[in-house]
Amino acid sequence: MRQIIITIYEIYLDRLTIVAEQLHREGLVIIHVYEFGVIIGMAEEKVILRIRNHKEVASLVEDKQVHIPPPDSEVQ
């Protein structure tokens, strides 16, 4: 599963709970829903492809993890 960040179009913010429920039924595991239109969740690749096609979804990006070594570590 991949962690994703979904942004919902502003015109659908009054239906945010309904949109989140629809995405959950599609297979999204919801971690958090922010009232300003951002949904954080986890989904398999095939679910991500389906979610991208929802008219309410303005953007969908994968949350990337970056690991930075401590300042005193050796350069690789």
Task: Please annotate each region the language model reported.
Residues 1-10:
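Short glycine-/aliphatic-rich beta-strand segments at the starts of folded cytosolic domains
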Residues 9-12, 34:
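Sequence-level detector for tyrosine residue identity
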Residues 12-19, 46-51:
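Short, conserved charged micro-motifs
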Residues 25-31:
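Short secondary-structure junctions
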Residues 32-76:
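Autoinhibitory propeptides
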